[in-house]
Amino acid sequence: MSTADTTAAGIEHGTHVSETAAHPQPSPSKGSLSTFLSTYVFSKDHKVIGLQFLFSTLLWFLVGGLLALAVRWQVAWPWSDVPVLGKLFAQQGGQMSPEFYTMLFTMHATVMIFLVIIPVLAGAFGNFLIPLMIGADDMAFPTLNMLSYWFMWPAFAAFSASFFVEGGAASSGWTSYPTLATNVNAAPGSGWGQTLWLVGLTFVGVSSMLGSVNYMTTIILMRAPGMTMFRLPMTIWAMFITAVLQAFALPVLTAAGFMQLFDRTLGTGFFTPEGNIVNNAVATAGGGQPLLWQHLFWFYSHPAVYIMILPAMGMVSDILTCFARKPLFGYRPMVYSVAGIAGLGFIVWGHHMFMSGMNPALGVTFMVSTMMIALPSAVKTFNWLGTIWGGKIQFTTSMLFALSFVSMFIIGGLSGIFMAATPVDIFIHDTYFIVAHFHYVLFAGTAMGVWAAIYFWFPKMFGRTMNEFWGKVHFFLTFIFLNGTFFTMHILGAVGFPRRLADAYHYETFHHLQPLNAFMTYCAIGMVATQIIFAVNFFWSMFFGPVAGRNPWNANTLEWTAPSPPGHGNFDYQPVVYRGPYEYSVPGVEQDHLMQTDPPHPAAAAAAAAAH
């Protein structure tokens, strides 16, 4: 059929044909280097950029995971020869020095937070899914979209290079607290390594800001005909609210980062107090307040917690409804709860600072606001349970990961209640209880959501499905090793095991905990090794997996009306939306789902009228 015939057919069926569908892009000549670069490297197509983010974050996830194993090795068996890293850096004859240990946990957290969790959620899935799920051809600003990806690589280069400069990588924690971070002579890693850390953080911030502006504009202005805001899937609502969080919180961290950089290089004194001495190094300027950095840093970094989990919540909501074959329980309350979590996220940052010396009355205020955030979180949790209750559950790999996301989020949320109370926080502050909490929320929670999303949208990305058997093997082994690693941390934290010491067994009271740490390290090694199964399944399925149709899961949302994988312009015709995203098991309808593009169904309308 010719383009003109296709256009006419689209108009005849009551749809509007997109510009890219009516006027396809000319096919570039094969074998051209410039064509390859513009198509696969410096592409402006949202789908290619999303996959670039996905492949890059999987690489950075490997780097962050190996750094984590090195940290776990030192905690379990301090002063023993470290495999691989010991030979690579020759630290004290193959053993890890305390200074290098602090560099490792600093860079592990930096890589995992700024190069893995945030970009895989907002960058990979946000880019790939937003235009497809709202019925758009592409992002509003394709060039900015491309730049948002390429700004991540200078950040990775800066973080990586910091290991090879004089003094080594940053060692003041991913929080970069003054005055350790502002005094260039304070400790190994406080010199060029810390400066490169701040430079890398700036590039990450620019990337995130470009993405957030693009996402908000695209969702507001480029929705398909009939796609009202309350017909958007929860994935899009979560991405939209996450973009709002980034747009309002990120400038604060960026400004604070520049202020700290100026303290280090230009002699200003924003965060350095007068006469400050760290490790016999006297500060060259003074008059600043270290507490100011904490307020500015956590004003961004607590909303960043929700930037790192809200997209996963949205994607899990869509996956649960699909495989429970039921509508989402309480769609509008779910939307309002996401907005409530985001709003409260801006007024709870002080719970990270209960032990910082701030006014205790202010601490009580932050304690109350922190406990309030449990309300919208509980709404989401019970609505997820209501969604799957009584459903015709299909236990696919994606569904298993989605269900485990809910359980991991519950565990992480319950442990957070302990830390929200200032009297309790006095005892568990800076212990492994804190480490257990944020790993359950940000790794056990978010990573489970990411794996669920990969298995779910893989057919749309590559036109093939992943192997379900090996996917379930990957799930069960990951679930076992993950909980073996992180649940045990609650026990360590409850008895006061400190989180940042290279050798806590220097204190006799912790000697009996070494077997627990060894057990956790074995589980961590098993968890990392299990990802080999995922990697083989992922890349094998890309080329040899079973061919998927447009809608292998019988889902409802717009991306499943596009070809798998979608071509340039995404859709054959401009989709028109007639209904919400969760019309599963509709009374009076033979099939168990109605897609958003299905016109009003007479039988369903009659059944609804009879019900009233």
Label each PLM-derived region with a short phrase.
Residues 2-612:
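Membrane-embedded and interfacial regions of multi-pass energy-transducing membrane proteins
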